[in-house]
Amino acid sequence: METKRKLLNHFLAALAYRTQKALRGAPEDFGSFHVMDGVRTPAELVRHMTSVLGYARTHFVGGRYWPETLESFQEEIERFHEMLGLLAQHLRNGDTLLEGMSEERLLQGPFSDAMTHAGQLALLRRLAGAPVPPENFIVANIEPDRLGPDQAAPASPDKDWPEAPPDWTP
């Protein structure tokens, strides 16, 4: 696989990891957590992440992608990970990008957009009263073939967490 595509594939794996990091251990009702009008719920964010990645996929296959609302947050999460797998397959296969699209534009557009929303999920966890424990992502066990919801446990969780909830233990 060409170098740029390897990097994009790794980026998708990092996106899978960071998204699951933000979702792992979330309260049961987190998908419907509502901060205020005009702010997406976690379920809406995951659907939007799938949408922007589906848009990226149209630059391989053509057409449009507009995901329907699914019944559960878990289904939204599963569809998101399926979309990561579909995109990664196009990258691995060396599929041609449609005219006017490049690997750099995929990164600066939909891929980066989706990563931004993974960070928003982590922020919503804090606002929901269930913050995400910190870790050193440089040493995270991120594998390009691991794009599903079953992600590795933190390789280097932080032992010190000044903003930790009172009941947190490392």
Task: Kindly give the residue locations of the regions a language model identified.
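Short, contiguous alpha-helical
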Residues: 5, 9-23, 28-68, 100-162, ...
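Helix-adjacent hinge/juxtasegments
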Residues: 58-97
